Structures are given as C-alpha cells and as structure tokens.
Amino acid sequence: MSSQMTVIIAGIVLVVAIVVALVVMRRGDSRFTYDTQHGTAPRATEGEGNTASTAFKGRFSILTTGVGAMFAALAVKLWGMQMVSSDYYEKQANSNQTRTVTTPAVRGRILDRNGVALVQNRPSLAVVAYRDLAEDEVLVRHLANVLGMPYVAVLRNIQDNTEGAQSLHTIATDVRRSTVAYIQEHAGEFPGVKIAERTERQYPYGETACHILGYTGTITSEQLEAQNKKTSGDDDASAGKITYQSGDIVGQAGVESYYENLLQGIRGEQTVKVDASGNVTGQAGAVPAKAGSDIKLTLDLKIQQACETALASAIELAKTTGYSNAGNGAVVCLDPNNGEILGMASQPKFDPSVFIGGVSNDVWTELNDDKGSHPLLNRAISGQYMSASTIKPLSALAGLEFGTYTSGQTTNCTGYWTGLGKSWGKYCWLHSGHGTMTLQSGIANSCDPVFYDMGKAFFYDEQHPEGLQEVFRRWGLGKTCGIDLPSEGAGRIPDAEWKESYFTDASAEDRKWNAGDMTNIAIGQGDILVTPLQMACAYMGLANGGKQYVPHVFLSAVSRDGDGDAYKYNGKGKKKRLEAKINSDSDLALVRNGMHDVIYTASTSLAAHFGTLTPQVYGKSGTGEKSGEDEYAWFCAYAPADDPKYVIATVLEQGGGGSDTAMHVVRDVLGVIYGEPDTSSASGDSSVR
C-alpha cells in the first residue's frame, strides 16, 4: 500500500476522532439550576463536592486516552499492511485491475516412421466469454441460437468452475466462419463474447490408420477428475506441468489416448489490464504455451495403405464368391526382428474427423450399434476368434516336444476319424480323406486327423495332460502381447479349470474336460480364442527360432520447441517377450518345411500366386467354423523365409476358406513391399484349409 494512501486513511480517522470528541464533550453528565427570582441564566453545577471543571478534565482525559489508543492501533495496522502484508494487498489491488487468461497449447502431431504427418493441426476459431456472462439470460439464449447449441449447454460451458472466474471460458469450438462473422458484425448484441484462435485435428489421409491413431474429444468429467488427482498440489500451471480444465481436448482412443502425456502440451497464461467495466486496456505479462511433442510411429504409410487396400479387396472378393456376409476383418504386418508394427488395419473403418467439435448422438449410436459392425473396434488387437488351422504349427511343436506325436509317426486319414469311438467320430475337413499322413504332410495339407491323434494323446498323457495348452501359452496365446495401444484382447486357452468355472449352468458331467475338447483345440477349434496380433507374434517366434519381441507402434517423440528427440523407444521391444522354447532345431525345421509345403506343394493356387514373388514365403492357412455363420478365413506367413523381415497375419470374418480369400491379403501386401504385384489369375482352391 502506498504512503499517500496511508496519509489519507490517517486523516480520515483523525477527523472522525475529533467529531466523536466534540459529541462526547457536549453530552457530559451536567445538572442545571435556574434563578427564577432574578431571571438569570442557568448555572451549571456538579455533584456534591465536585466542580464542573474537574469533571470536564476527567472526561477529557478518558477521551484523549481512547483516541490515543485508536491511533496506536491504527498505526500498528497500517504498519502491518504496508511492511508485512504489502505483497498480499498489492496483489489484491492488482487483481481488480487485471485478468489472467489461460492459452491452450498446440497438440503434438503424429507421424509415420519416415516423418509423414498422419495427424496434424489446422487453425480454427472458438467462441469464448467470461463467467459473468451467465447472469444475462437473454444474451445467453441469443448466443445459443446463433451457435445452434442448446441453451443449457452454453450456460454450462460459461459457468464451468474448473477454469478461473476471470478466465475466458470456451463456449464452442471449431465454429463456422459465417457464425464468427455474424458475431463480430453484431458485436453490440454480444458484449463480453470474444473470438479466440484455436487448433483442431486434421487427418491428411482420411480414414487411414484410424484404429491406430484413434481420435480426440472433449475431456469427460471422469477423465478430468482422474487427471486432477494426478496433478493435485500443483498450483502453478506454468511450472512445467500438464494441467486440464473442463472443455479441454484429449485423446479418447488409439495413440491419441495411449500417448496423451506426450501429445498434450502445457497451457500458457496471459495477464491483461482491464478497466472498471472489464474491458482490456493493455498487456501485463505472459507465459507462453508449450506445444506437445510430435510422435513418430513405427508405421510405414506405404505398408499401412497396402494393408488397408488388400483387406478391403479380399472382403469384396469374398462377397463375390458366395460369402455375402463378409465385411469385417483385420491384418497385422510387423518386423519380426524388433516387434515394430509396420501396418495394421481393421475393417470397417471410421472417419476420426467426425469427433472434431463433438460427435452427434446419431453418429455415436451408429458407431456403437450392437447390431452393427462396430467400426470403432480395432479387430487387429481386440477381435477374438478361433485360430483355426493357423495354430497347427504350434500344435506340431507341442506334440514333438512331449512325444505325443513323433516325426516318424503316421495317420491314415479316411475323412472320418473314430479315435474316440464311432459315437464320437469327427470329420476331416476333406471328407474324401488324405490317405497316409506324416506330421509334416499333416501341416502342409492341414489334415485334421493327424492333430486329432495328437490331442487324444495329450488327454491321456498322465504326465502332461495339458502340455498342449502349456505350449500355446508359452508362445504368447491366452494373454495380451503388451502392445502400446488401448483395449488389447487376451484371447483364451481353455483347459479343465476354465471349463469347470465357465459353464456354471451345465451338469457336473458336462463341465468336465474331455478328450473331445483337447482334439478341438489341437486344430484351433472349440473354445480357443486368439487375436490377429497374437498370431502375428506367434509366427514371429516361428520366423525367429522362438524369439519374440514386444509389439509396439511408438518409435520416438520429438519436442516441438527445438530440443530434438524427447525420448526414443525404451528398448523393451529389443528384449524377448517370452521364451518360446523349441525342443530341437529339427522340430522347428519339420514345422517350417510343412509351412513351405502349404504354399508351394499342397496347393496349386497358392503356388501360382506366391510363386511370382522373389522372396520365399512360409505360411499356414486356416478356416474357422462358427455355428450359424459362414466360415472365417485366416492366413499367417513370414518372408523372406531365409531372412525374415515381415510377418503378416490376417482374418476375414465370414470370408470363406483361408486359401481362397485371406491368402490374397498376404500376397498383395508383400507385392507392394517388394514391388511385385500378383499377376496370377488362378482362382482359389480348397486343397488346403
């Protein structure tokens, strides 16, 4: 507080004290007598033994003592205000002359591995206002009509208490320029309403990689509460901390959500001077906002687009070849040497730009309709399916390891297997039978009875009755792979304990694990569930001799303020995800030979299509059977066979046989990678499943 103000206050107190003194003196306790005989004026007299002068002096002494005490107290208070609490009162005074406005930070971009922007920002306009605007109902309703928003929504945004009372509150974002022009041209109708520059997300390649990139949206109350708990105790928004307010835009899915802490910037502050009416008269200071970091992904845009195009084409092929219910599917392409995801597609796709500025109820319902195809679902990591015959290479390794099926063992396939008795007979997918099959030819021709024999042997093996499940889990099935994306599915490897607890309404006898259950999972049927990503990771192990790495999409983060790389992938992907133990090199060689024969020996169609590629490809098809639906088509492979650089796993829901439709996804993606498109006109055949 200034010395001038101190003097003024002291003067006012002095005047008040004098007035009080005069009043008190005039109201003394005097008694008056009158000389009625001589008509003289009244004479003041005091009590007995006292004079008026003595009484006056006493009262004056008391008065001066009181006034002195008042001045002493005032002096102490003024000293405290000026010397001890001067900073506090100065801030209080300044707060009545200034307003602090938070400024949003620009969100970081998302790039592919070559620096191509997959998500960037574009300028946009927002309507903002101070909280006291809420007191003018007529104005709020007028503004709501102009913005095309419900009155309650506008009022709620203005009254939002997560932003400071003197901060500008965001009422609407990404406002059309025609609306902005109207507000500016009729500024007199909207006192206190302002237009602010903002940025919104922009997707240069539309729906490309939508399930990986995700989308953004306004922070929910639950998210805001959670974020506030994380930053509780941090009162200074400019102290290098990410803070959140109602109305903020945050990641809601995909990379946008998983790496929110990197993409979100640190808001700034701008202090402005205002007059008594609240009008801005100048600048008082500013703390600039810090943009979020750019994230570089492992994705290669060329491979990503190839995955999406190949998947869509295969689905259309399935529709034209008798599978009219085809429409959904997924594909994963990764580098087996480090776990980097090079491409990942899920069908159907969605347009992430529909979430900018808020998604309508109709669109949200359409995207989440239980009867629809769930376009928001990333089937590559969240879709869970029967693995079908793509799991047979792992079954073969399990049989070889535990001795339930040896390399020299044979099975006579007649098309109908009765290993558990005629009443429990099972068909091979090829009803005419394959004849005599070894384990290698069983893989090549996908002969079911070979694996029925193996499943039966496991069930009756007293030492390793669940050795098959043990191997599946060792190769990463039945648990998440650990990818850095939200909502990864764990799949399921059924066993006796699971069956007992799952079918609670069944009889005790029906809840028991039986030999039929084991023969089912040996061929990838029954209650087994896997994701396309899990199968890609399993085939990563087949390509690498058992080595598997954590699949990931993050490559590095680059600071926007010129600091360079914020940090790179922490190396977790360079460590083994798990030890997929292989009993011997000869076991792996047998399985790989079987996968070679799938493509180049057992099927003339596959040989025709893949034979035009320079690198050799090892793989396995699969055809899942689900009651009441068409067959599910699978194909998993890696290439080049002698030095694997790419692993691809794909599934088409109700898309037919794996060697008929799904194999085209793998062939087309490899064709783009190697610049060798599929020129074969050979139609799919059913010689392998």
Pin down the residues of each PLM region.
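Periplasmic/cell-envelope proteins involved in peptidoglycan metabolism and beta-lactam response
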Residues: 1-359, 467-474, 656-689
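Beta-lactam-recognizing serine transpeptidase/beta-lactamase-like catalytic domain environment
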Residues: 273-286, 299, 329, 336-390, ...
